[in-house]
From Swiss-Prot:
Enzyme Commission (EC) number: 1.1.1.169
Protein name, UniProt field: Putative 2-dehydropantoate 2-reductase
Gene for this chain: KPR
Protein species of origin: Arabidopsis thaliana (Mouse-ear cress)
Domain of life of the source: Eukaryota
Gene Ontology annotations of biological process type: pantothenate biosynthetic process
Database matches in PANTHER family: 2-OXOISOVALERATE DEHYDROGENASE SUBUNIT ALPHA, MITOCHONDRIAL
Amino acid sequence: MESRCKKGYFRLAVIGLSKAKDCWEKNACAVTFIGDGGTSEGDFHAGLNFAAVMEAPVVFICRNNGWAISTHISEQFRSDGIVVKGQAYGIRSIRVDGNDALAVYSAVCSAREMAVTEQRPVLIEMMIYRVGHHSTSDDSTKYRAADEIQYWKMSRNSVNRFRKSVEDNGWWSEEDESKLRSNARKQLLQAIQAAEKWEKQPLTELFNDVYDVKPKNLEEEELGLKELIEKQPQDYMMLKELIPNWILGIGTLALRYDFQETLFNGWHAIAELQQLKLKIKLNSLLNDQADTESLKAARNSALNVIQAMIIHLVLTLKGRFSLPLTEETVRFNEPIQLNQNMVKDGGYTAELFPIRKEEQGEVRR
């Protein structure tokens, strides 16, 4: 409902919706929104006339900020705003200060009551000021003064006006404000943490649940996207790295010393893991579940080799043992515990749980 032509179209659709609700719910009405630029579309006028004739319980809310993107209202129409257009079609019309939250609330409540009790349409024209740009591609300072924008942003700020009103009436206080901000921040952080745990949907989901039977042009677009991802995978990597930086750091450290061949095998496993990680990401994006499972198995195998390398590296650096690195060695060693609070030179300090005496002897034999 953002484009103007779609806004005009929905003027008609919402009228049908409002009449349909009469069949099963009497205490209800439909509400639709439009900007001052959208009122220049033909469907807006057809919608007003249709609603008036059908006596549809619908509330039309027009946000008149004086600009249709960069076109001023003086270049759109010569009438006294939008409210007179509703009157011309026999519709009760209200003009209200759209920057006053309490005034808007009062006007909408009155309009809804009229629409429901009298079964008739109502038009509300909210006179507002658009502080921001129309869109990210718009620079409103090219067609209006920056000082004007700053004045409305600071001196006529609608949020500040609302807060002053509720504080003057004793409905709000600085303590309430502090509690609200604290609770809102806490809830926001919790929501972000929960959202980060959700697994991202594959890009192929963009093409599902749009049509009952996927049309040919959509299939071609989906195929084109898959080909593009395979050619330029680096541009579509949206998941976190599967390999933490500390693994790469330890692998680099291993190359500085003359360690056994297993350490170099571990380094090669890191490189292999990088490739597997990339393939798993691509399969996740392309929703290729079968191949992903086999890749994950290969990834786990590479991780085992890397874990063995880390254990051997830590033991050697600490001078505790000089053992051949085998599956038994890895199996008898307890898992490495990474203490992320011990950060040095951008890397992590690896701490190793003690190995039990009897297990040490069995390994040595």
